[in-house]
């Protein structure tokens, strides 16, 4: 799936709020870089952490609530 399609799906998950999406992706990418386990099947050696985080949001695996709670 193309990045544009994933981004469109992720935006729908956060109510089309680009600020929320960027916050969620940035925090989740940081967590992934610090050793968190990806919630989607992704080859972390071939994908950037931000792309994995975006895919997690698009699939509804993570949202703003999880970021605020510190998960």
From Swiss-Prot:
Gene3D superfamilies recorded: 3.90.940.10
Gene Ontology terms describing biological process: DNA-templated transcription
Top class in the EC scheme: transferase
Catalytic activity: RNA(n) + a ribonucleoside 5'-triphosphate = RNA(n+1) + diphosphate
GO CC terms, sorted: DNA-directed RNA polymerase complex
Keywords: DNA-directed RNA polymerase, Nucleotidyltransferase, Transcription, Transferase
Function, as annotated: Promotes RNA polymerase assembly. Latches the N- and C-terminal regions of the beta' subunit thereby facilitating its interaction with the beta and alpha subunits.
Subunit structure: The RNAP catalytic core consists of 2 alpha, 1 beta, 1 beta' and 1 omega subunit. When a sigma factor is associated with the core the holoenzyme is formed, which can initiate transcription.
Family label: Belongs to the RNA polymerase subunit omega family.
The name this protein goes by in its record: DNA-directed RNA polymerase subunit omega
Organism of origin: Campylobacter concisus (strain 13826)
